[in-house]
């Protein structure tokens, strides 16, 4: 249970806004999501240092698709639906010194396209 930078964003499918960065113990749920990009990720956040070096790229799935986990919906083929905005948190090890976040989204061909840069204030 190590402290980490926990970075919060408010996002819509087309635009992310920086909310805050704290040093704290990430919640278990957040640590489970701290992973490299995989095929299920629609969105990713690249963490860049002051020298322009990519420290880590974190897959965040699709934060704009809410899944239903209610009793009575288990037999549905699609358990969820789109949402217009989401709060997004990522955890970054303290030895990294983030300066810039690059938000990218997968295009129709499955390639990630950067669509926004957010510099730490």
Which residue stretches match the model-derived regions?
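Extracellular glycoprotein-like low-complexity segments
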Residues: 1-121
